[in-house]
Amino acid sequence: MEQEKRVFSIDVAGRPLIIETGELAKQANGAALVRYGDTVVLSTATASREAKNVDFFPLTVNYEERLYAVGKIPGGFIKREGRPSEKAILVSRLIDRPIRPLFAEGFRNEVQVVSMVMSVDQDCAPEVAALIGSSVALTISDIPFEGPIAGVIVGRVDGQFVINPTVEQMEKSDLHLVVAGTKDAINMVEAGADEVPEEVILEAIMFGHEEVKRLIAFQEEIAAQVGKEKMEVVLYEPDPALEAEIRQLAEADIKRAVQVPEKLARDAAIEDVKAGVIAKYEAEEADEEKLKQVQEILHKLVKEEVRRLITVEKIRPDGRKVDEIRPLSSAVGVLPRTHGSGLFTRGQTQVLSVCTLGALGDVQILDGLDLEESKRFMHHYNFPPFSVGETGPMRGPGRREIGHGALGERALEPVVPSEREFPYTIRLVSEVLESNGSTSQASICASTLAMMDAGVPIKAPVAGIAMGLVKNDDHYTILTDIQGIEDHLGDMDFKVAGTRKGVTALQMDIKIKGLTREILEEALMQARKGRLEILDHMMQTLSEPRKELSKYAPKILIMHINPDKIREVIGPSGKQINKIIDETGVKIDIEQDGTIFISSVDEAANQKAKQIIEDIVREVEVGQVYLGKVKRIEKFGAFVELFNGKDGLVHISELAEGRVGKVEDVVSIGDEILVKVTEIDKQGRVNLSRKAVLRDARNIGGELPRESREKRGRRPERHRMKP
């Protein structure tokens, strides 16, 4: 049946949100064009007709940026978009997290959700349009999606919450919180905050959820008019008789195995049980499909037992209490030649973070859809396979590494000093050396220690902790500092980072359909208790940032010049500034207001570069005496360089008190002579007199005023001095 174009509209934060269906991408299972202000995003949802032979739900979410959306042509030689930007990967994950839990257990059809950003209005966030568009595309399609969901951004300006803040409002906001959910519950939260108390965070989440509910009602109206009938699918379920047989065979052994406290030993014990059961069925010559079911049933039994222990017996696999943190240890200064390093260990999770300081010219240049063009604070996260005792390829960062790195960056950025306070580019790299859950939060703790070790004057130390949840019917248990098995088999991974004062970042992923206010509140307060305990431990390792930077870190010298002189310092095609850099070995960054940052490991090189720049911008003053160098001789006089690039003419009549027949009788090229500035004419030409210097010296009955040479300050007396 031919689809007709339909247009639906609702007001969101004072701006129209328009959904168009039935005109574009009609071969997808579902498609929606979202217009929010001048932001335009096309979201599509497509599914395979047959289930895939896999043991997981194959969902892919892609957020595609197009630089034409902001009137840009991509840089480089290729001139087209390549791999997704970091922002695109983060938004893809942002959309994935709230929609993934809303597909039925056992659904194995491949689903792909694509949001293509076609036009960007900076006051109307494209990620919000993409999140809503993805939900609409799934909801009106024939894909069995148990939504809809919706999401909004919540800011806080002057103590008041704001939905989808504009760029101007965001600059004043101490909170950037993305909340998504169904009409009944919240199922995704992601935030960056400037040390905001937990109570305020909770109210912001609930404030955002009220708008979410309104947007869901809007989507339900759309689905009622243009929604397709859902396709019939067969959900994967293992053979009940086989499950009963394996339960009888392995349940007791699994109960013992999951309570082995140490991770590697527990994993080995569970694998031994599984291997024994699989070997039995292999001996019976079971086919591949049956063996696959055996493995899935065994996994289900392990999951059930872990969850039963936690919710019923309040026992965790490693024997801890539900609110107990694993043993902590930390150290700083572990790498001798780096600018700062911190090692943080929590149980069998261990992260080494390294802080590197650079000049402002080392900032990361961004070429994306946002207004931001550069970034001076970076946190990168690496997760090598040896951290979990496995082999594997060492490739570039994947989506998970980029997501964890960004979360750590968001958590630490509020405490990083401003460019004026600390004019350095800061790069943190977190190397995961051991992993048993909560590595992203361990990287925040290790990075805090690394910055303090490097002497970065952070406003306050930051720690992070991951909270878990196991929910069975109406009973639930919240876990502090979850380990790998609790994350894998539980219902929630709620990461909370902050200072003693408040939250700086949080991220919530869940596997169930949503959480209530009560669960969120309990998780936030339990996380605060754990965070303060970790901060107490970190302060025992290093209580405050070091007063001195590492001797291997660059030293930065700041100077100010008249902005009108910037072009003189740079020179034609950068010739002058490159000459200074080549001569001194420093890095130089110049801002439009005339502030110059000179950086080098060698303080003497900084001072040398500063002197050269001062000479370049120095103004010649009438009446002043300078020590100059004869650069050129003509019949009518000598041209004398006073300092870098500044010269003047000593007429032959001004070379000496008596009559001078030839210029060469008094001076030669290369001589250094004292001259007085007598005039700067309308054309900027400088007239000099050596005779005036001699006369002044004779009038006061003294010798030639040699102290005037100090005005030059830096040129050695390599040539003879003429009286």
From Swiss-Prot:
Its cofactor is Mg(2+). Keywords: Cytoplasm, Magnesium, Metal-binding, Nucleotidyltransferase, RNA-binding, Transferase. Residues 711-723 have a biased composition (Basic residues). The keyword Phosphoprotein does not apply. It holds the Pfam family RNase_PH. GO terms for cellular component: cytosol. It is found in: Cytoplasm. Transmembrane segments: none annotated. It catalyses: RNA(n+1) + phosphate = RNA(n) + a ribonucleoside 5'-diphosphate. GO terms for molecular function: 3'-5'-RNA exonuclease activity; magnesium ion binding; polyribonucleotide nucleotidyltransferase activity; RNA binding. GO terms for biological process: mRNA catabolic process; RNA processing. Residues 554-613 form the KH domain. Mg(2+) binds at residues 487, 493. The keyword 4Fe-4S does not apply. It is an enzyme of class 2 (transferase). Its EC number is 2.7.7.8. Residues 623-691 form the S1 motif domain. Belongs to the polyribonucleotide nucleotidyltransferase family. Involved in mRNA degradation. Catalyzes the phosphorolysis of single-stranded polyribonucleotides processively in the 3'- to 5'-direction. This is Polyribonucleotide nucleotidyltransferase. The lineage of its organism: Bacteria, Bacillati, Bacillota, Bacilli, Bacillales.
